[in-house]
Amino acid sequence: MKNIPAVALLLTLASVNVFGQAAPVVGVADPAPLFTDKDPVLHKNKQAAMHIVIDLLAYGHWNEADKWLTERYIQHNPGFSSGRDTVMKAFGARGGGRPIPTDPKEWSTKIVAVTTQGNDIVCVASVSTRPDPRNPGQTYTTTHFDMWRFVDGKADEHWDEGQINAAPAGGGRGGPAPGGGAPGGAAPGGGRQ
């Protein structure tokens, strides 16, 4: 009889999904203030990060990449090559871009947080919606991040959670994993679904 509470607890725990239901990731209501700072250098770098995330990645204005990326732009995502010209050639061919909403609350990329280290590193976390492999036809949200090191107000180096896909059946090269560094087939440095 002494073990009844322990057995009841064990049976209760066994009936609960081990992974549980994670809270959905949501963006902040107004992301614009996250890209500002009292320090003028950090403010310039946060603004550049905002333009990379919104103008380039979300809305495809790759013709403006030279405003926000250094010429050497070092890419640590294994699915993409380094160099601003390489990025512009690869993603600029997609067209001139879509109109950017003037109200940041209407941006397609939902910003979760912007963090910094010193005044040259800026990290932007955003919502990423992915297909749920456990439940076909359903999705879940997680957090995508892009981190840059800035030099003179331009991104000089980039990191994200990029992964390499397996090679396609029948040969060929693998590419960036879905959502791993370029969710939704977006450009290097992120992209959002």
What are these regions (language model features)?
Residues 6-17:
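Bacterial N-terminal signal peptides
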Residues 62-121:
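A solvent-exposed, acidic/Ser-Thr-rich amphipathic alpha-helical stretch
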Residues 99-103, 129-140:
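Short, cysteine-centered beta-strand-loop-beta hairpins and adjacent loop/turn segments enriched
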Residues 109-115, 128, 143-149:
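Hydrophobic/aromatic beta-strand elements that line small-molecule binding cavities or substrate pockets
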Residues 92, 124-131:
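Generic short beta-strand segments
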Residues 21-63, 67, 71, 175-177, ...:
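Short, low-complexity N-terminal intrinsically disordered segments enriched in polar/charged residues
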Residues 1-4:
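Positively charged n-region of N-terminal signal peptides that target proteins for export
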Residues 143-171:
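Short beta-strand edge/turn micro-motifs at domain boundaries
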